[in-house]
Design a protein with these regions (language model features):
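Ferredoxin-reductase
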Residues: 2, 7-102
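Reductase modules of NAD(P)H-dependent flavoproteins
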Residues: 3-8, 13-19, 156-157, 161-270
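Short, conserved phosphate/pyrophosphate- and ester-handling motifs at nucleotide-, phospho-/glycolipid
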Residues: 49, 133, 235
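A short, basic/flexible loop-to-alpha-helix module at the beginning of a structural domain
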Residues: 110-120
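Short helix-loop-beta connector
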Residues: 119-124, 225-226
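Conserved beta-strand elements of the Class I
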Residues: 125-128, 231
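Ser/Thr-glycine-rich phosphate-binding loops at phosphate-binding pockets of nucleotides
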Residues: 130-136
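Histidine-anchored nucleotide/phosphate-binding helix
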Residues: 136-148
């Protein structure tokens, strides 16, 4: 056996190798999006809003992994993920076929910038998302710490089609019955837009910001660095545009090492 051939086996023995977890449930929302829940190792810790590597065994036993935001809050005993389906994608073409009882691989360390530690204190928290980019915010809006830090939370979700909003709609509808944050559900506002189908709000979220519709609809003033904090996750175009709008409004980009008024997740686009 060559050294190269032995490499996958050596990785499997490494203390840093992914753990094997069991799929607990799977729900398909559209032909492009699905959510699933898996077991959570007792030693696995993360901050709400972070991402982790997950995947499946690939050819020759080598793990096929991709970064996924954790959609469940840090206190949850299970781990939830919200994924796009890519028919010819090396991982998602197979991951979309998983069923309860199947095994998936979970990385041992979570990271990310969409965390409260990367923001300075503020009054209002904006969570701007497109597509599956809502996943880290599904974690954040179910975290009690969010409502201890902010008086108001505004979650925006922009998708191509109306059906793709369903995950977020179900999430927000269930919030009032959440045992830990249900009493704060009235402080969360859910604002949706659709870009490729008829909808009462058929436009990009950045257009809603630029023409002032977002703020007039919500009854709040435009972005203000004195009161507003922003997190952004989704398409590359949206990340770029909202970053520019934040900077134009005077907000400073933050990080774990240097907290600011807005943060974006640069590790991947969803």
């Amino acid at each position: 056996m060559t050294e190269a051939a032995a490499q996958p086996a050596e990785k499997a023995k490494s203390p840093n190798a992914p753990t094997e977890e069991t799929v607990l449930s799977v729900k398909h929302y559209t032909d492009r999006m699905f959510a699933f829940r898996i077991t959570r190792p007792g030693a696995f810790r993360f901050r709400s809003g972070e991402f982790v590597m997950i995947g499946l065994e690939g050819p020759n036993g080598k793990p096929l992994l991709r970064a996924y935001s954790i959609a469940s809050p840090s206190w949850d005993e299970e781990l939830e993920f919200f994924s796009i389906k890519v028919q010819d994608g090396p991982l998602t073409s197979k991951l979309q076929l998983i069923q309860p009882g199947d095994k998936v691989l979970l990385g041992r360390k979570s990271v990310g910038t969409l965390v409260h530690d990367a923001l300075t204190p503020g009054k209002r928290l904006y969570l701007f998302s497109t597509g599956t980019g809502i996943a880290p915010f599904a974690s954040i809006i179910r975290d009690p710490d969010t409502y201890e830090r902010f008086e108001q939370v505004i979650l925006t979700h922009t998708c191509r089609q109306v059906g793709e909003l369903k995950y977020g709609q179900d999430l927000v509808a269930a919030l009032k019955d959440d045992p830990l944050v249900g009493e704060h559900a009235h402080r969360l506002t859910h604002y949706t837009t659709v870009t490729r189908e008829p909808w009462h709000n058929q436009k990009r979220i950045t257009t809603c910001m630029e023409d002032g519709q977002l703020y007039s609809d919500l009854g709040v003033p435009p972005l203000n660095p004195a009161t507003d904090r922003v997190m952004v996750c989704g398409s590359l175009d949206m990340l770029t545009d909202i970053k520019a709008l934040c900077e134009k409004a005077g907000l400073k980009e933050g990080s774990n090492a240097d907290p600011g008024e807005f943060v974006i997740e640069k590790a991947f686009v969803g």
